[in-house]
């Protein structure tokens, strides 16, 4: 039996986790979600897990938690109590994060505590090495395992070159747990919305779809206000604004008054606007062209020249939007997304997880640290 351990009170966290089950990465038949009780989120977590028939268990105190039956424990988020769970040495402990990004959160030293760490490809490995999180020895001994697009998430978008009936996607990230990790383009001056409106007008595209990060407004409620005001701004230009449906807990008023809910299975996207976030790599994997907002913090982890050149082409500078195509897109994608072992590429995502469980169960690295 496998476990996914979750110590997080943010409601959006459980939806990010559940998406892996919906996508078929994790199997309800052999994986249990173990989450800590928090008054603010308990009922929501319980309801969502029950809705998708995901085996789960909750606890009040980590000291009373029995983890002896689990062969592998997966972690999507860092938390202090993770350190306590790692003392259960009958299991191997794997940090899979919840998407690949160039945020500072992806290189926190706490990541060293896990037996194994999954990343999407060479970009992730480089991030760890350049920032002293792991060593070449760790890489050579497969403590860091490249699992390609297994855990980066899958969107409901597809690339389309025909502007007719196409959408512009805006996917702002949240404001982060601390100010230094604030990557959101949502702002009081509505800069991102104004930029998108100008692009829509120039491109003669009338449809906008918004997928705001589910944690938007958790640290600072004014970011929900910025989103609200931005939507009204777009609609004032007779643009049709639709909601992906992710951003709806605590903010159903947005859906009710400002947004048209859509039931489409796939959304044809002509152009996407994103922040420094996992959406960048997710859309790149699906060949959807992106422009990226980089706010005043300017703390994206982009050290390799290949990424610097790429960012020069996709970053929105002032009010100027570059129209230059990225010829090296396949090379960029291969840098972000790759595999430690060639056999993984042809496997389905759930088979890759089976492979990972089998691999770490046979390896002894976790017992050396």
Task: Cite the ranges covered by each PLM segment.
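Active-site-proximal region of nucleotide-activated glycan assembly enzymes
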Residues: 89-154
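Catalytic binding pocket for nucleotide-activated donors in carbohydrate/polymer assembly enzymes
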Residues: 225, 269, 278-345
